[in-house]
Amino acid sequence: SVRVNDWTTEWTYLDVIEVVSGAGANLDCIMLPKVQGPEQIRALDMLLTQVEKAEGLDVGRIGIEAQIENAMGLTMVDEIAAASPRVETIIFGPADFMASINMKSLVVGEQPPGYDVGDAYHYILMRILMAARAYDKQAIDGPYLQIKDLDGYTRVAERSAALGFDGKWVLHPDQIAAANEIFSPRQDDYDHAELILDAYEWYTSAAGGARGAAMLGDEMIDEAS
């Protein structure tokens, strides 16, 4: 993906033309920052279509990653996710978002001082995640700027992974291994999932009694499992 300037600048259309004209055949997505509404996604979609046609590329081959970085973008995130089939990913941009809502923290991604009743980012992350899941998009958490604080990166990455996010940005090579480990299935989870599938297949078969639900140890399993 290539990040272009947002639509509030005078450079966006030139960025898109230059990037797609120069590297369109090897380009997967354009990342659009500071998205505030579906009209900005549709505008990028139309521009991409024109440049793809001009360059002889298959129309629609280049996706869009929409970054949510302010309050307006969050309130419109459902419409943004649904704005175009090109949209593949919804990304949280914590630094600009914190500034846009006047959050009292100077460390991006960390809890604001004085707020000790929960996670100040929980609503934001869940709002983005629900829109992404409702419209079958990826949900990606944004960067952690304290690149030397690997424990801090791990802590906030585990938070978004626990909610169901598909990944988190890395800004430094030291963060890569942590991101891969956190957002990859654990072997224990994989093995347990295999047991559930095997047990469900057996118990729903004629030989296993053709049951709709069964027990796997102390756990009830059914189609939803």
Regions found by a protein language model. Name each.
Residues S1-S225:
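Expand to "…catalyze enediolate/carbanion chemistry for C-C bond making/breaking, isomerization
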